Amino acid sequence: MDRYFLSPSGDGRDMSSAIEEKLKEHGVCILGAGAYYVSTVKMPDGSSLSGMGNATSVILMDSVSSGAAIELGSYCSVRNMHVTGTDKKTDVPDTLGDRHGIRFMGDATDFNREKIQPKSSMIEGCLITSFSGGGITLMDTGYAIDSSIVASNCQIMRCGAGINIFRFSEYHSFTNINCTDNLYGCINNGGNNLFSSCHFSSNKTGFLIDNRNGQSNNNSHGSVVGCTFNHSDKNKGIGIEVLGARHGFVFSSCQLFFSKIVVENSYGIVFSDFNCGKAEEITVKGGGLVSFRNFNFSKEPKISVSDNEKVETINFSLR
């Protein structure tokens, strides 16, 4: 095991090359307890990087204005560590930036659908904090089912977006991800992405789909199941915001307390089996079919609909 193990330098120098050398030589690198400062760890295909839980901190150096602490290749895994943008105390960013935690990146566009992109990778059991961009960022990863990641059992805090999915990025799966105290809990601008048992609570905005300018022909058409969207922007913000989604999206078996739903110029958006608390507002503007089914409220919600004759509200009840 010793040959796979790497200790921290203890002097704050860039450990990126040392980590990459272990990964290239053995396919595995195990980081011990302590702080590992990096400019970017570029993981070779098929490699695995793991730590000792929150005792291991991979820290993106302050000198890096744009980039990621860890860049995934194909068939990579990152497990059991704290990945952070600084060793200093930080607040939630005011704007979305370019410093990311763990990034899976290709170069897909609307026009190169056949080009091979990076393949399946995994993220598990990580605490990710203090990045101006995404804690987990998926950038132009393409349209193939195996050009995707599976992420589970992570906590993401004080980032521009807990999860940041760019356009032309599909088939990613997230389970038991707690995105809290971020500017956005999740920005999901790709398609066919799945979220289950995740928390998008106590962010400025909980969950955003934004295709309002038609930037991507392949947007939305995914699902969110069993997730929470509570206490957005100090109980006055938007829990779910869907803008310009053209191909449908399903939110099912979710909880929404002290947060709003906003849907604009979108089609085939389904909200079903929601438990709602106080201060909820639902706003729909333009677009086509938007369906709200089996909603339970603690008090009568405020519902506003304009320029849309296809909004359904089925089985609304007060407890």
Question: What is each PLM-predicted segment?
Answer:
Residues 35, 142, 169, 213:
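Active-site-proximal loop/turn and secondary-structure-junction residues that shape catalytic pockets
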Residues 3-30, 37:
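Acidic Gly/Asp/Thr-rich repetitive segments characteristic of extracellular carbohydrate-active
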